[in-house]
Amino acid sequence: VLGGSYGGFLTSWTVGHTDRFRAACSERAVNYHPSMFGTSDIGHLFNEVEIGGLPWEMPDKYAERSPLTHAKNIHTPLLIIHSEDDLRCPIEQGEQLFVALKKQRKDAVFVRFPDENHELSRSGKPRHRLERFRIILDWFTRRLAPEPTRGR
């Protein structure tokens, strides 16, 4: 499973709630709503509408709707891709989930792109877009390859 932006959020959320997938890639995702509220260029608007209030009024609801809260349930190998200059979904969103997974010794890789923003996959530097494609292709190729069979 793979997604970016809201799709990245859904990817992070999904792997925290099912082990159905053999590999996942979450790009430029919101992973922790309480910090997105104050760090994203739209966090103070989006989260209030999407969650239905302010973080200090409903901290439990903000946390419950955050993939980071469910990191203990993530068993799917997860590739996290983020751009360093992303103001929509700041890079700390990816860093928080990555650190949570590594602290639990889970299979996670974090790839950061310097001098790129939320639009990396659509209008980023050509060399970065190509590198991103190669990283994703390699990630899924290695994790989805058939397991070797044992001969007799």
Regions found by a protein language model. Give the residues of each.
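Active-site-proximal cap/loop segments of hydrolase catalytic domains
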Residues: 1-152
